Amino acid sequence: MMLILKLSLLSLLIATPGLLVSGANMITCYGDVQKLHCETGLIIVKSSLYGRTDSTTCSTNRPPAQVAVTTCSLPITTIGDRCNGLPDCELKTDLLGNTDPCQGTYKYYNTSFDCINGNYAVICEHGYSTLDCGNDAILIVNANYGRASSQICSNGLPNGLTQNTNCYAANTLTTVAGLCNGKKSCTVEALNTIFSDPCSGTVKYLTVTYICTKEMVVCEGGSASINCGAQTIKTIWANYGRTDSTVCSTGRPGSQLLNTNCYTSDTLNKVAAGCDHLSTCTIPANNNFFGDPCPNTYKYLRIVYACV
């Protein structure tokens, strides 16, 4: 099950108070280095805007014509794609390659981010590491194979092999998520044969950020009982419906299992309202509670959650 449709996962993490450590905002003039840092925890970008919304920010030594337009704002994902899940992140803004939302105006980047609890692994090229969640399930937050720092995995290497710090393999997140999501443990390798070579002539490394989650599946007519003991519940994802023809299928006619595109849009809200911030909760898996998103289909309730 691919839970990390990237935007929806990050939205859930941003809205998860139990995982939140702290938050910050960073403004960087175009051409300078944007530096995001978490004293404790890992970066999750909430929003990044490129443009200009006032005439004073990043205006020193700029002619009035370059700071006059203050209705210029382009939401971007580049910074989140590269920084999410890292404890520290430095990006040269003139290398981000974003579209110019207002030509002739001197712009800046305004990034708002949170620091969340999570697990972070760095694997040098040709190496491997095992991600381990014990009895819980892995959920990948972000991953990159390439190089964003000249210092990491650089011991004994000539400078020429570590100077390209704008190296990102576009398929890293989906590849690692496909290998690891939902598993208790997962071994990942930092190899060109797995991720391709995004920057030939540069020695690369793999960074992976993940959280450990629990999962519960209850067939229609049953009840989901969650117990986090001394901790409290935080719902990460939930759906009442059917997305798999084999789950909760025993003794059911095939006609009740065919529709695997059945979702209840407010499942997460209802489960969160009944469970979040509590140590225990019980949620019924029935049409009376959730409504019937797909008549004549036998449904089930799937909840992914963390104890925080």
UniProtKB/Swiss-Prot annotation:
It comes from the Eukaryota. Residues 27-115, 123-213, 218-308 form the SUEL-type lectin domain. Residues 1-23 form the signal peptide. It is found in: Secreted. Expressed in eggs, but not in liver. It holds the Pfam family SUEL_Lectin. Glycans are attached at residue 110. InterPro entries: Lectin_gal-bd_dom, Lectin_gal-bd_sf. Its main location: secreted. The keyword Secreted applies. PROSITE patterns: SUEL_LECTIN. Keywords: Glycoprotein, Lectin, Repeat, Secreted, Signal. The keyword Repeat applies. GO terms for cellular component: extracellular region. GO terms for molecular function: carbohydrate binding. Homotrimer. Lectin that binds L-rhamnose. Also binds monosaccharides possessing steric similarity to the hydroxyl group orientation at C2 and C4 of the pyranose ring structure of L-rhamnose, such as L-mannose and L-lyxose. This is Rhamnose-binding lectin.
